C-alpha cells in the first residue's frame, strides 16, 4: 500500500504536504502511509480516489503497472510460467483446492494469465490479497480445453447443468475429462456464456446456436 500511495502522489505531481492538505490530514499521516507505518482508512482512500479521478490519474493502470514490474523482475527457469491469483482474505498455509465445487472446472485453485481478471474478483474486499505465482509445469499432467463445444459441455458439467442426464455416457465423458489432471487450462465463462449454456440445456437454442456463441 505504501508504494502505491507514493506512486499515486507522484502521478498527481504533489508533495506530501500538498496531498495532506487535499485529503485534510496531517503531513505526518501521509508520511506514515508512505513509510508503511499506517494504512489510510476508508474515508481517506475514497478521497484519494476522487482526487485521482479529478486529475485523470488511473489507479487501476498504476496497479497493473506495479504488477507488470514485479512480474518482469522474476526470473523463470525452463518449464515455469507466471500466473496470477486473487484471494478475498489471503492465503494461509499451503495452496489447496478450496474453491466451490461448482466453478467452471470444478473445485480447485484458480489462477490466470491476465492480472486484471484476478484484480476484478477481489477489488471490493478489504482483506483481499493479490499473488504472482511461479508454477513449474514440467512434471505435471495437464489438459487444455479450447473454447469450443467441448469446453461448453465441460463447464456445464461442473456448473451442475448436466444432472438431468446423470449416468449417461455423455455425463460420464465430462465427469472423467479432468480426472487425474494436475492443471486444467482453459477460458473462464462469463455471465453471457452462462446464460447461453442455460438456454441450451432447457431447449431454447440448438447446439449450432451454442457453438455460434462461443
Question: What residue ranges belong to the model's regions?
Answer:
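Beta-strand-enriched accessory nucleic-acid recognition/scaffold domains that flank the catalytic cores
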Residues: 1, 10-11, 49, 54, ...
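N-terminal positioning helix adjacent to the helix-turn-helix/winged-helix DNA-binding module
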Residues: 1-4, 44
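DNA major-groove recognition helix of helix-turn-helix/homeodomain DNA-binding modules
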Residues: 24, 41-61
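Recognition helix of helix-turn-helix/homeodomain-like DNA-binding domains
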Residues: 24-40
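ADP-ribosyltransferase catalytic core
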Residues: 67-73, 78-80, 96-107, 113-175
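Short polar catalytic/cofactor-binding loops
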Residues: 86-93
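Active-site-proximal loop/hinge segments that shape catalytic or ion-binding/gating pockets
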Residues: 149-214
